[in-house]
Each structure stands twice: as structure tokens, then as C-alpha cells.
A protein has these predicted regions:
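Post-HEXXH active-site segment of zinc metalloproteases
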Residues: 27-66
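Active-site scaffold of zinc-dependent metalloenzymes
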Residues: 1-14, 21, 27
Length: 143
């Protein structure tokens, strides 16, 4: 939040809170690290070290959860503060654009890009539902 005027921090803090609540929601729903219905892992990774395979799977699962949570955050802002959407999206795109390792746990660029204008969230009953459709689209593009 360095360099962001205090008057503009409120929407960012709400987005961060919504992001964390999305993690809690997925966990409570019993779908933490689960793909949505109809999705399956395809392909087969190989490595001589089983620990590397486990780390790769963990990063992939984390990236998916982070992508979903970023979308819930953006859906929340679109619903609650549409006038701030472009600014919050730009901030998140910048944060996610600075990943040190592509495809690591916090590389959610594919999902953030899909939500560029906020229109894709539509009129779903909750930010969780609004994020789900965009999340699925990102899953198809991410893997």
C-alpha cells in the first residue's frame, strides 16, 4: 500500500478482506483445492524427485485458490464500489504482474486479466457465484 493515498486505501482493504473471506468460504464449503464439477486434471508431470512433483502440485492448487479469491475480491468491488473497480483492478494487476516465478502460487494473472472491466461478473446473487464462472474460464486457460 506504499504510495497509495490514504483516501484510496479503503477499497483496496475491502478487496483484500474479500479475498481472504473467499479462502474461508472455499474451505467451509469443503472444496479447498478442489476443481469445480466437470473439471479434471489432465496430463502427467514427471520428475526424478517426488518432492518436486508434490511442490508443483501444491503450487498449482494454490494458484487456483488464489485466482478464485482474487476474482471474489474483484466481484465484491464491482458490486460494492463500481466507481473504484478500474483502480482496484489496476492495483491487483500490478501486484500480480510482479510475480517472481511464473505459474507459482500467486501467479493469478490469467484470472485478473479475464476480469479487466468487471462486466463478466454479471448479476449473480453473491460475489462467490459471480467469481465462479470467470474462475472456470481461467482454469481452462491456465493449465
Amino acid at each position: 500500500m506504499a504510495g497509495i493515498p490514504e483516501a484510496q486505501q479503503g477499497a483496496l482493504i475491502e478487496a483484500m478482506a474479500a479475498h481472504e473471506i473467499a479462502h474461508c468460504w472455499r474451505y467451509v464449503q469443503g472444496v479447498w483445492h478442489e476443481l469445480p464439477a466437470g473439471f479434471v486434471e489432465v496430463g502427467e508431470e514427471t520428475a526424478q524427485d517426488a518432492e518436486l512433483l508434490a511442490a508443483s502440485k501444491a503450487m498449482r492448487e494454490t494458484r487456483r485458490e488464489e485466482g478464485y479469491a482474487d476474482l471474489v475480491a474483484l466481484a465484491w468491488i464491482q458490486r460494492s464500489h463500481p466507481q473504484d473497480y478500474a483502480r482496484v483492478h489496476g492495483w491487483l494487476a500490478k501486484v500480480r504482474g510482479n510475480v517472481a516465478v511464473p505459474r507459482s502460487g500467486h501467479d493469478t494473472r490469467v484470472w485478473v486479466k479475464l476480469a479487466e472491466n468487471g462486466e463478466q461478473f454479471g448479476t449473480a446473487a453473491t460475489p462467490f457465484e459471480a467469481a465462479s464462472t470467470v474462475w472456470r474460464e481461467g482454469l481452462l486457460r491456465d493449465e
